[in-house]
Amino acid sequence: MAKLTKRMRVIREKVDVTKEYEINEAVALLQELATAKFVESVDVAVNLGIDARKSDQNVRGATVLPHGTGREIRVAVFTQGANAEAAKEAGADIVGMEDLAEQVKKGEMNFDVVVASPDAMRVVGQLGTILGPRGLMPNPKVGTVTPNVAEAVKNAKAGQVRYRNDKNGIIHTTIGKANFSAEQIKENLEALLVALKKAKPSSAKGTFLKKVSISTTMGAGVAVDQASLNTQA
């Protein structure tokens, strides 16, 4: 049996895996255990009551968290003309068309989010094999293919998170940093859960938000009592 690290021993002693914690208690526990030499991210896993094998029950979308994610997001925009100027004014880090596509083909991808106007998809479409595996391919379902590129840039910069269930029907995303206040993490989590409720597939039956767990980058998951959250859409 593998030897437990000191940190893992402490986590095992502190975290009751059979318990659902009130949100403020859960955050306090995470912050106590976030002892890495860097500021750890706070991540969430939401088990959904869906059959992920059925395409009509898959959940995908994006929402802006009220307090952002604590990360500085670099945004690349494929567009031209007046939209290019609007994107730059909105804070886009890189704006272009064929020239930007050439950078991507060379592996020069110093950005976290890609936005495209519909007329640019003829260029972006050629980059699917590069952007797709990295989760960077623009998609109208998450608002990154849009005629209003300026709004998409502002949303990305403001801390928009994209979500998509995995094959087990679980959503994984980041909702902040370990140095956020408990209230900031709570409000970010509530905003995400409200967005997920709105995205519930009509064919999904029974309890939709089955389990909510939060963790830090290097820590264990802590189950959250949903009764301690305000998720009224």
Curated annotation (Swiss-Prot):
Gene Ontology annotations for the cellular component aspect, listed alphabetically: cytosolic large ribosomal subunit
InterPro entries, alphabetized: Ribosom_uL1_bac-type, Ribosomal_uL1, Ribosomal_uL1-like, Ribosomal_uL1/biogenesis, Ribosomal_uL1_3-a/b-sand, Ribosomal_uL1_CS
UniProt-recorded Gene Ontology molecular function terms: rRNA binding; structural constituent of ribosome; tRNA binding
Pfam family, one: Ribosomal_L1
Lipoprotein recorded as keyword: no
Keywords for the protein's UniProt record, in alphabetical order: Repressor, Ribonucleoprotein, Ribosomal protein, RNA-binding, rRNA-binding, Translation regulation, tRNA-binding
rRNA-binding keyword on record: yes
Family to which the UniProt record says this protein belongs: Belongs to the universal ribosomal protein uL1 family.
Function: Binds directly to 23S rRNA. The L1 stalk is quite mobile in the ribosome, and is involved in E site tRNA release.
PANTHER family registered for this protein in UniProt: 54S RIBOSOMAL PROTEIN L1, MITOCHONDRIAL, LARGE RIBOSOMAL SUBUNIT PROTEIN UL1M
Subunit structure of this chain's protein: Part of the 50S ribosomal subunit.
The name this protein goes by in its record: Large ribosomal subunit protein uL1
Origin species: Vibrio campbellii (strain ATCC BAA-1116)
Gene name of this polypeptide: rplA
